[in-house]
From Swiss-Prot:
A motif ('HIGH' region) lies at residues 29-39. This is Cysteine--tRNA ligase. GO terms for molecular function: ATP binding; cysteine-tRNA ligase activity; zinc ion binding. The keyword Chloroplast does not apply. It comes from Mycolicibacterium vanbaalenii (strain DSM 7251 / JCM 13017 / BCRC 16820 / KCTC 9966 / NRRL B-24157 / PYR-1). Zn(2+) binds at C27, C205, H230, E234. It is found in: Cytoplasm. The lineage of its organism: Bacteria, Bacillati, Actinomycetota, Actinomycetes, Mycobacteriales. Its EC number is 6.1.1.16.
């Protein structure tokens, strides 16, 4: 198997540190708000990697963290008049619901940043002792100048680096980045040898990686927007602490709209509830996973409907075989399918094999060759199962699609409905109306009743 490693800048042969075992760390969500389809693409992409490695016989340890303490979380919770931990927990549930709706397997462990403060403090102490970090006005900073090859992941020249953290009086060098933030009034804080405070984002992931996977592990994954500064700063800390850290760095491309990254700050996000009105969850999963994980995925309604139609074609063939021939159990994937996934997870080529098998199977079925049709159907089930979208899997077939979508959407929407109620309680009518309008754009109608707010999909489905 070969994978593209961002650090080396090319495709390399992959072999795990421990034979038969693969360790993967995926940078998860900063739970500050509702997830959109851009957020969950990495979850789908690396779920395929995990499923493929498992199918090949590896024991996979898959860690996906939750960043539950962050400047944005604190600011948004404060603006809404809610405790920061409640805010984080609310949107953590929303992300979990989104992953589940799309059939992403639960991680082996899902550590929260706030549960690993002790490990972060210990890491920072090691960096200070080794001369790579220093204190200043209650904060702790990493000294970039002490690591000559800083920038090797992203290609940034060390002299051109600026961390963009604003003016900090305790910084010796504007290239340095924050490991620990000194306590501020009204913010959560924890005791440390250098005073109370809270962790910096880059420190959190290093501590959690090493807590669950050790000082050296196989794969660190995440979106391409994390290459700099987040992953660059993770490497800096780990190497400065004397650890080997990740052997492969994998990064998925963005979901774009109009050629720009899907982002709340750009106002071009597409909420999951809105998409689940147009296509089934399995079809959305198929769409998000159909492009090569490193490529950009430009969203369009046409592309979404084309993906739904392609998925429905696979589903229809499997149903035809089951009706005419009998039970269809997963069989063996084709050699070309396996070769495609071994070539840096080339899902488009793998899907071409699925559709070739479907076409041949349909011809065989029409000709009355039931044995050949069944063989192709069994192979398709195996291949689509590895891609997490087998139409005959109990996950997709046993649950009514509308009910399944509503169950996922309910968790996502309740978070925003609660925000609207909080705004109404503060008599912030403008904010309450803005939230209602955003929900409507996402395909959700909110109605105030004597029993409290009720929401419904604009297609008429009540909740």
């Amino acid at each position: 198997m070969r994978l593209y490693d961002t650090l080396s800048g090319g495709v390399r042969d992959f072999a795990p540190l421990r034979p038969g075992h693969v360790s993967i760390y995926l940078c998860g969500a900063t739970v500050q708000g509702l997830p959109h389809i851009g957020h969950v693409r990495s979850g789908v992409a690396f779920d395929v990697l995990r499923r493929w490695l498992t199918a090949k016989g590896f024991d996979v340890a898959f860690i996906r963290n939750v960043t539950d303490i962050d400047d944005k979380i604190l600011h948004k919770a404060a603006d809404a008049g809610r405790p920061w931990w409640e805010w984080a927990a609310t949107y953590e549930r929303a992300f979990t619901a989104a992953y589940d709706a799309l059939g992403v397997l639960p991680p082996s462990a899902e550590p929260r940043a706030t549960g690993h403060i002790t490990q972060m403090v210990e890491l920072i102490e090691r960096l200070i002792e080794r001369g790579h970090a220093y204190t200043g006005d209650g904060d702790v900073y990493f000294s970039v100048a002490t690591l000559p090859d800083y920038g090797k992941l992203s290609g940034h020249r060390i002299d051109d680096v600026h961390q963009g953290e604003g003016v900090a009086t305790g910084k010796r060098d504007q290239r340095d980045f924050t490991l620990w933030k000194g306590a501020k009034p009204g913010e959560p804080s924890w005791p440390t040898p250098w005073g109370r405070g809270r962790p910096g984002w880059h420190t959190e992931c290093v501590a959690m990686c090493e807590s669950y996977l050790g000082a050296a592990f196989d794969i660190h994954a995440g979106g391409m927007d994390l290459v700099f500064p987040h992953h660059e700063n993770e490497i800096a800390q780990a190497e400065a602490a004397g650890d080997g850290f990740a052997r492969f760095w994998l990064h998925n491309g963005w979901v774009t709209m109009g050629g720009e990254k899907m982002s709340k700050s750009l106002g071009n996000v597409l909420a999951i509830p809105a998409v689940l009105q147009r296509v089934r969850a399995a079809e959305l999963r198929y769409y998000l996973g159909s492009a090569h994980y490193r490529s950009m995925l430009e969203f369009s309604e046409t592309a979404l409907q084309d993906a739904a139609k392609a998925y429905a074609g696979i589903e229809d063939f499997l149903h035809r075989v089951r009706t005419r021939v009998g039970a269809v159990v997963p069989g063996e994937w084709t050699p070309k399918f396996g070769a495609a996934l071994d070539d840096d997870l080339a899902v488009p080529a793998a899907l071409a094999e699925v559709h070739a098998a479907r076409a041949e199977g349909n011809r065989a079925l029409d000709a009355g060759d039931h044995d050949t049709a069944l063989t192709h159907a069994m192979s398709i089930r195996a291949m689509m199962g590895i891609l997490g979208a087998d139409p005959l899997d109990e996950r997709w077939e046993s649950r009514d699609e509308t009910s399944a979508a509503l169950a996922a959407v309910d968790v996502l929407v309740q978070a925003e409905v609660q925000r609207r109620e909080d705004a109404r309680a503060r008599r912030d009518w403008a904010e309450a109306d803005a939230i209602r309008d955003r929900l409507k754009e996402a395909g959700i109608e909110v109605t105030d009743t004597a029993d409290g707010p009720q929401w419904s999909l604009l297609d008429g489905t009540d909740k």
